[in-house]
Amino acid sequence: MTAGLYSAGLYIPELGHLAMILALCFALVQSVVPLLGAWRGDRLWMSLAQPAAWGQFAFLVFAFGCLTYAFMADDFSVDYVASNSNSALPWYYKFSAVWGAHEGSLLLWALILGGWTFAVSVFSRQLPQVMLARVLAIMGMISTGFLLFLILTSNPFARILPQIPADGRDLNPLLQDIGLIVHPPMLYMGYVGFSVAFAFAIAALLGGRLDAAWARWSRPWTIVAWAFLGIGITLGSWWAYYELGWGGWWFWDPVENASFMPWLVGTALIHSLAVTEKRGVFKSWTVLLAIAAFSLSLLGTFLVRSGVLTSVHAFASDPERGVFILIFLLFVVGGSLTLFALRAPVVKSHVGFNLWSRETLLLGNNLVLVVAASMILLGTLYPLILDAMTGAKLSVGPPYFNALFIPLMALLMVVMAVGMLVRWKDTPVKWLVGMLTPVLLGSAALAVIAGIAYGDFNWAVIATFMLAAWVLLAGVRDIFDKTRHKGLIKGLPTLTRSYWGMQIAHLGIAVCALGVVLSSQNSAERDLRLAPGESMSLAGYQFVFEGAKHFEGPNFTSDKGTIRVIRNGKEISVLHPEKRLYTVQNSVMTEAGIDAGFTRDLYVALGEPLGDGAWAVRVHVKPFVRWIWFGGLLTGFGGLLAALDRRYRVKVKSRVREALGMSGATA
């Protein structure tokens, strides 16, 4: 750090630390005073919830800005900066390094939680004051827990004094990638966002009323959190594919599982909220799902930060930190389930529905998703529990997860399509058969045509084509049914954003499933030695290796290969895979050369140099792999579109007042 910058920013870290303490003070006020106000019926005390939320968020923004300044100014007197940055690191990686390790990522988590709290306080003013006070108080309690954890065990502003290092130890080379600038914030937006659904559920339990108005207010927040988490998972898969050099996009890594489980439960939650909003049923089940979604988010935090597992995603962390999070997790789960047990008798549903109804299909959807999440939870935690109890080492790998998860997802797609077509409360069987018959016949025909066009009659491929067509055609059939009275042209503009969001999200699932199966079943791969001038053929492509040249990067040295790709005598691409040595950490990284296409990726990675200019080279041809991430982004976009539906913003105040009451409820 230069003398001028150091002089100008001498006390910036101390100001950042003070801002975290002040944010904690506001969080404590937000946790206690409004809740007491709701219990006493004191409007003044309840009204303090919003300014407390704003103050907490403002100080967290300031603290985050102070840490960002420390990175940009190369303030290596700050231990966290010295451990995760370097003067030669490009500025954009210095910025992403702010959340590149445990302490900074936890500050980002607290900031995003403060942001969600601020958003709820601003956009939920139509809520009865007592309900809003309870919601913000619950979120304040969560913020208090994380801020205590941050300040007591994980201070990102701790100094290295008096011996300040001349330079930093650099950011982990795995994290020096554009994908890691956006992947963690998106993931945290989802993780933390489920705290809103949790807070609404607990607040409604405290008031003793869960009905359509509560579900309507919870649902858009839950959908947004779910969409961000899905986008974050998708970006993480894309990053792993091109950055790790293995050519894979999902490894059933424990930390991948830790993010996937709350997404699955969140998917069940948004569908259950839809039933509660529309029909007033599944209230207890919906509350349990809200508790489970946020609890699984906390479990993911524990797995990443406790040191109990080894993963490319995990932070090297003091196990004592894991104990703090585990206690917090047990407090959240135990406290919320105890409250649920006390309040459950007053939130029972008394509305009936028949077997062939949308309620039944959505319940089936919920059960499949919860079973899938439970199966992943068992496979993730069992090795850890076995190790803790017996010391035995066991690895649960892809064969277990694939054998159980794939059939469940196939069943989910079947239920998904039928669920779009059935009616609420009761559906005449004859009418439903009439709706589904053309969908089934069309799906079978499209699957056969697609199989012929694709040139592969592998049963898994044909089944996936049929399931994807089943979902697509069911959606089209439902659109025609919804617009039959006005006609297709006049009827389409009358369909709501929520409806279009649902259709796009379901389409995204179908597209993603096609990408998963086609890329997994039909990928081609070869590992071999190539010297300059030599070539190899794979899946109809010829790869000509022209050698590798050495060059210097800003904080690394690289051997960059050149590989020409030829098909039918015509050059279609030139790929430049790299082998990088990050000099500060003496860490070797592989940067794949990828020619991305709509129907296939050509993927080349350099292995080790073998002498005389020859290299070990890994070549993949991956059909339709991009469809995995395109489908994931479609699903996330569908969720965000659905959350913008006008019905979440109009004619709500009167319904909420009627359902929850303006006063008189006890906390």
Q: Predicted regions: what is each one?
A:
Residues 526-618:
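Soluble non-transmembrane domains of integral membrane proteins
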Residues 96-97, 172-177, 599-631:
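Short, aromatic-rich amphipathic segments at membrane interfaces
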Residues 39-60, 119-143, 206-227, 252, ...:
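Membrane-interfacial loop-to-helix junctions in multi-pass inner-membrane proteins
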Residues 3-44, 62, 76, 254-262, ...:
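Contiguous transmembrane helix-bundle modules in multi-pass membrane proteins
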Residues 21-35, 39-42, 105-237, 245:
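A conserved hydrophobic secondary-structure block that centers on an alpha-helix together
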Residues 61-136, 151-171, 233-277, 300-323, ...:
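Membrane-interface helix-loop-helix modules in multi-pass inner-membrane proteins
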Residues 56-71, 139-152, 289-297, 366-377, ...:
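Hydrophobic alpha-helical membrane-insertion segments
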